[in-house]
């Protein structure tokens, strides 16, 4: 498995050329690169030579070494969400690499810094939502691998304000999934307003998001019951710190089983699966005064909660999107301090179409990460 060596921190003067007035590594940035691109939703995923993007004055250019593969990438390719994608599009929003160039207005970054590309590539930073640190809700949010070419390429741009700061010496392959999956589930767990010792159910516990959610929940002091299908997935959940596991393919009464394990229902439920049925079941087994957090985004899904039960049990149902800059810093710190590990499988970027097939079939344990060098 390829591992990154230290980047040279040699900075050239501001210069004009193919990339305008920017600061770059003394070694030249190439004009072309390898990437995976599609020209229509659901169209062929082409691994080919494409131009290296030019960073704007407020952007950094990152030499992406590794990128996680997220279920959102599948939706972007299919185009089955209400928000239209940029076309043609390079997907990906979990890119980890090295800063090799910076726009003339960028401050606080150095050539050679480790940096990450998140789902939120940039925002206006002046609207009500941005002022309250809810940048992901900005009406002008720019989304990596959706409205902005993402990390399934060797070089990608990111707004210098939103790019994730990764500590030097970090394993870039393992940290890649933290940039979206890790931040997303960490924010969701915070949104559940739990306290140490509380039970939390993770629906979709063995997948890319779920496998990280189990670990973050454990590190935050919660008791975890994982929900997923299959013996192999149950073993993974237990290995990652889950106290109990419910196999939805075998249980006769999932609601009753979860409530029995948790002595009345979990205090919080984090729904990271893309199952509408699983989301609706969570409103039934959550503990009175508990919180159901919706994270997974199955196309066209509707969550239903029986009103009498909802009111009498005084439950909360809320959505949780990606985290802000503080959430990102905290989520990365959990990883850097060894509290969270990414169960990953690394394959070449050229194999991305095969990864999409496995994802569609629900056959992925943990997270796939692509190595952009092949």
From Swiss-Prot:
Pfam families from the UniProt entry: ADH_N (PF08240), ADH_zinc_N (PF00107)
Gene3D superfamilies according to UniProt: Medium-chain alcohol dehydrogenases, catalytic domain, NAD(P)-binding Rossmann-like Domain
UniProt-annotated binding residues for Zn(2+) 2: 124, 127, 130, 138
Main localization (coarse): mitochondrion
Cofactor: Zn(2+)
Top EC group: oxidoreductase
Alphabetical UniProt keywords: Metal-binding, Mitochondrion, NAD, Oxidoreductase, Transit peptide, Zinc
CDD domains: CAD3
Binding positions for Zn(2+) 1 per the UniProt entry: 70, 93, 180
Co-factor binding details: Binds 2 Zn(2+) ions per subunit.
Localization annotation: Mitochondrion matrix
Transit peptide: 1-26
The EC number(s) this enzyme carries: 1.1.1.1
Protein family membership: Belongs to the zinc-containing alcohol dehydrogenase family.
Name recorded for this polypeptide: Alcohol dehydrogenase 3, mitochondrial
Native organism taxonomy: Eukaryota, Fungi, Dikarya, Ascomycota, Saccharomycotina
